[in-house]
Curated annotation (Swiss-Prot):
HAMAP family: NaMN_adenylyltr
Organism: Mycolicibacterium gilvum (strain PYR-GCK)
Protein name per Swiss-Prot or TrEMBL: Probable nicotinate-nucleotide adenylyltransferase
Enzyme Commission numbers on file: 2.7.7.18
Enzyme class: transferase
Alphabetized GO MF terms: ATP binding; nicotinate-nucleotide adenylyltransferase activity
Catalytic activity: nicotinate beta-D-ribonucleotide + ATP + H(+) = deamido-NAD(+) + diphosphate
Length: 204
């Protein structure tokens, strides 16, 4: 599951659990982005903080793990590089790449997006009522095998990282929106203070 996780919230965890159940996945690997190229319009919390919050949030679920492939690679994070690294580490596994439906819409507009679907199946998770828009998406889906792309609605994705950051900046509670350990980490590190969050548009 790829995402900025800035911060990781309960919607991410519910989405991962739901997808693991629906697709009978042995493991869900959370992959925090290193330097997200599409987020230059706002400050992004340091990668190590986002990585540690993800470790804290997923620690209690034996089906969840966290990978540093994007962080340790350095430079801007691109989905194609993430998939190549995960494939190299898991040559015999059936890979499913879980991402936000909005990010999936962006991926399908890139050049050579077909290469990524040769490495993994894609699962776009979204809040109820979200629809993929755009002629390029319809055309892309028509070219893909039936099992290459799935959309899953997750009610908990009404929670957003943008809202969590804004609440933390305003000293409003984020309890029950993010795991308890992440609440404590954000407070200890004084994250999201003195920031001016922009729009979401991120991988969840």
């Amino acid at each position: 599951m790829g995402g900025t996780f800035d911060p990781i919230h309960n919607g991410h965890l519910v989405a991962a659990s739901e997808v693991a159940d629906l697709f009978d996945l042995h493991e869900v690997v959370f992959v925090p982005t290193g330097q997200p190229w599409q987020k230059r319009s706002r400050p992004v919390t340091p990668a190590e903080d986002r990585y540690l919050m993800t470790v804290i949030a997923t620690a209690s679920n034996p089906r969840f793990s966290v990978s540093r492939v994007d962080i340790d690679r350095g430079g801007a994070t691109y989905t194609k590089d993430t998939l190549r690294d995960l494939r190299a580490q898991n040559p015999d596994a059936d890979l499913y790449f879980i991402t936000g439906a909005d990010a999936l819409a962006s991926i399908l507009s890139w050049q050579n997006w077909e290469e990524m679907f040769a490495i993994a199946r894609f699962i776009g998770v979204s809040r109820p009522g979200y629809e993929l828009d755009g002629k390029h998406i319809s055309a892309a889906m028509a070219e893909l095998p039936a099992d290459a792309l799935h959309l899953v609605e997750v009610p908990a994705l009404a929670i957003s990282s943008t809202d969590c950051r804004l609440r933390a900046e305003q000293s409003r509670p984020i309890w029950y929106l993010v795991p308890d350990g992440v609440v404590q980490y954000v407070a200890k590190r004084d994250l999201y203070r003195n920031q001016n969050p922009a729009g979401e548009g991120e991988r969840p």
